[in-house]
Amino acid sequence: MKREQLYSGKAKTIYATDNPDTLIAEFRNSLTAFNGEKKGEMEKKGYYNAQISKKIFEMLEASGIKTHFVSMLSDIEMLVKKVEIIKIEVIVRNIAAGSITKKYPMKEGTIFESPVLVFDFKSDEYGDPMLNDDIAVALGIATREELATLRKLALRINELLVPYLDEKGILLPDFKLEFGRRDGEIILSDEISCDTCRFWDKKTGQSMDKDVFRFDKGDISKAYEEVARRIVPEIFE
């Protein structure tokens, strides 16, 4: 089924399949931070992220959110629907953390009264700058109607994710989403994992995500494994 490699990103490799409507996303063990300036490897990282993403995609699908997920072909290979990626990173923030506390007078750990939603231009060349609607439209990235849809979907996903993770003892300070166009609709794509979310332990406040690698906070392998144990405990049975 797997055919030629189409693209290799920071954490996944994308392959064509015999079906022009589907692709294979292979989750790798590579770690990157600061736009690729810091690099590393972690055993089982691809496995944990793939399994976490699968479980969350299934939960979202069951709640009416359309995603690109089709099935798992192996522990690290996900069959996905082919989409036209919208070059916008949609960031949803529930708790002040990371870059927002450096750019604005916000104290880390501050809980927002309502989610803060930010659009960034998905471009390594330009350093993923923040977008407003006018710039996004001027760049031809999306229409105003599509931007409204992205907001609606992102906030709905947040409404589903926060209680889902809370039950597992995980806080969700913020996370990044990517979407794509398919058959006239906008659907969730990419992944939802320790690479794309900030996960904090509900009791201790400790990071259980890529920040552990980014800022040398401890054992990155244990952090990802702990999240996997809480979200997909069945893979450890």
UniProtKB/Swiss-Prot annotation:
Pfam families registered for this protein in UniProt: SAICAR_synt
Disulphide bond pairs: none
Top-level EC class: ligase
Pathway stated in the Swiss-Prot or TrEMBL entry: Purine metabolism; IMP biosynthesis via de novo pathway; 5-amino-1-(5-phospho-D-ribosyl)imidazole-4-carboxamide from 5-amino-1-(5-phospho-D-ribosyl)imidazole-4-carboxylate: step 1/2
Coiled-coil regions listed: none
Gene3D superfamilies: ATP-grasp fold, B domain (3.30.470.20), Phosphorylase Kinase, domain 1 (3.30.200.20)
Keyword Magnesium appears in the UniProt entry: no
GO BP annotations, alphabetical order: 'de novo' IMP biosynthetic process; cobalamin biosynthetic process
EC number: 6.3.2.6
Swiss-Prot/TrEMBL catalytic activity: 5-amino-1-(5-phospho-D-ribosyl)imidazole-4-carboxylate + L-aspartate + ATP = (2S)-2-[5-amino-1-(5-phospho-beta-D-ribosyl)imidazole-4-carboxamido]succinate + ADP + phosphate + 2 H(+)
Record key words, sorted: ATP-binding, Ligase, Nucleotide-binding, Purine biosynthesis
InterPro entries assigned: SAICAR_synt/ADE2_N, SAICAR_synt_PurC, SAICAR_synth, SAICAR_synthetase, SAICAR_synthetase_CS
Highest taxon above the source species: Archaea
A molecular-function term among this protein's GO annotations: phosphoribosylaminoimidazolesuccinocarboxamide synthase activity
Keyword Isomerase belongs to the record: no
Record family assignment: Belongs to the SAICAR synthetase family.
The protein's name in its UniProt record: Phosphoribosylaminoimidazole-succinocarboxamide synthase
Source species taxonomy: Archaea, Methanobacteriati, Methanobacteriota, Stenosarchaea group, Methanomicrobia
